[in-house]
Amino acid sequence: MSSSVPNSDRKIVTGPAGYILEDVPHFSDDFPDHPTYPNPLQDNAAYSVVKQYFVDEDDTVPQKIVVHPDSPRGTHFRRAGPRQRVYFESDDVLACIVTCGGLCPGLNTVIREIVCGLSYMYGVKRILGIDGGYRGFYARNTIHLDLKTVNDIHRSGGTILGTSRGGHNTTKIVDSIQDRGINQVYIIGGDGSQKGAAAIFEEIRKRKLKVAVAGIPKTIDNDIPIIDRSFGFDTAVEEAQRAINAAHVEATSFENGIGLVKLMGRYSGFIAMHATLASRDVDCCLIPESPFFLEGSGGLFEFIDKRLKESGHMVIVIAEGAGQDLLSESMKESTTLKDASGNKLLQDIGLWISQRIKDHFAKKMTLTLKYIDPTYMIRAVPSNASDNVCCTLLAQSAVHGVMAGYNGFTVGLVNGRHTYIPFNRITEKQNKVVITDRMWARLLSSTNQPSFMKQADKIHSNQLVGEPGTMKW
């Protein structure tokens, strides 16, 4: 690494052959004389057999791993993990954990593993849980967290800390952090919550407080960029199979039966796409990224008619954000409303399209349509085995980063390696399905559905290029 280049508060390090490190802030940036201490892990018997357990300071992870011989080395992120020196003495730490936004499988596992990581690995004894999301900071609601408190919470869905949307008041939150003497803040939440975490970090930095802020990204839709996937996603795809299986049973039990399942996916159709591929029983998958139309040649109604004549039944999976442009003008008026987190309130596309299908085929054939919306069932369940491992590693990586003095970062899996990512990279855009990518082609091949694209849409889609860092298989 050769030089550090200021870029509107971004910490950019450049090196030979086009190497770029998008680094995260560190305590040494603001407090160059801050003392450091030997990492307690070096005396931990559990890690005594691990060779090279501590991460080298120069270890980085590339954002893009598929390259050509003459490609520049490209963007990298700092590799997560424990360092040989830490910036906090265990007895001086007062940590807090907060969960924000909607529910997601794995929240309790992340809480548990932050507590266990701080306690077992670093000997931290004072850990607070902020009750009820961001507003819990200035409502003075806290829960004392220790190993006994969190022992079996991973077996339950939801979050023992409670959550809420909105309620972010940066000044009041940082006042509370300062008044309580908190010096480590762990924020578990989606893109909106990570923006809030970034604002908290900037205010803390402005006040020159020796407080570390780390984010653990939470989004069941998997719409956070850069990272391979977010925790809870695998569980959501697995749980969605129950609804799809039920829809398939209903559809095959009636003449011209249609099972319609609405899954989560406000702007990104990853759950719908992966649940469809996992099921193999779905005939049509509709997502926000791929426009469709109902009537005319190549439209949805024509495909439904064709499939019912061929098979006598059909299963459709639709993401909640798909087809919003097709809703009637009277329904569109209310879509300008937003929830407390600033998300646009969507109309129920599942109910609307169910009625449109029934109306269209009413005079053509006897048709039975069953509509299933498992949204809250899916997000309220405990995380599965895969997500439990994911949550554990994310939580431990966040703890290692904070103890090592890193600050103002989100932890995430990039190309199979855990990394520390600047807040701005996580919040600048959303991760979406690239419909010109091979994964969407695999889905179309699996369902044998048409693309539902009109000629103008096809021309536009051919101009799209997938972002490096989106989900790759």
Curated annotation (Swiss-Prot):
Residues that bind Mg(2+): D191
Catalytic activity: beta-D-fructose 6-phosphate + ATP = beta-D-fructose 1,6-bisphosphate + ADP + H(+)
Record-level GO cellular component terms: cytosol; plasma membrane
NCBIfam families the record matches: PRK06830.1
Oligomeric form and interacting partners: Homotetramer.
HAMAP family from the UniProt entry: Phosphofructokinase_II_X (MF_01981)
Name listed for the protein in its UniProt record: ATP-dependent 6-phosphofructokinase 1
Provenance organism: Arabidopsis thaliana
Name of the encoding gene: PFK1
